[in-house]
Amino acid sequence: MKIYHLYRRQHLNLTIHEAWKFFSSPYNLNDITPEFFHVTIVSRMPKKIYAGLMISYRMKAVFGISMDWLSEISHCDEPKRFVYQQRIGPFNFWSHEVCLTEEQNGILLEDIIFYAMPIGWLGQFINSVLIASKLEQIFDNRHNYLQRKWGD
């Protein structure tokens, strides 16, 4: 199984507590993702995330195909970092770590993503012609939205 990696970092002009409030809420996903990637939260959400929290989504991603996704907050260190991992969904493996580090005049946001495609060589091919570029689009959109909202 081939493991893929995506890493992004960005300086934002807000406090670590403001950043935590924004990034730890799955209700903000549609604000920071492109229109083709619409997310509906299916499960009930508590006021704060915690390690072990399961979140059920329905999303439209590639070609508008609707799919279910179940993720777990596997690690939560408020207000510094959290990790969510796919438990049920389109990938063989998905882990997204969000790290927030206080800096002068704001925070450093780091996104660390590891993922693996299903169906062997065919999944690797689909990743190379479609999925990798879609993920780049999603995180480019996220970067641009955040830059407009809290950028330098």
PLM regions: where:
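Hydrophobic ligand-binding cavity/cleft-lining segments
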Residues: 1-50
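A short, structured loop/turn motif at beta-sheet edges
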Residues: 16, 74-81, 99-108
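Beta-strand elements of well-folded, non-transmembrane domains
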Residues: 12-14, 59-63, 75, 90, ...
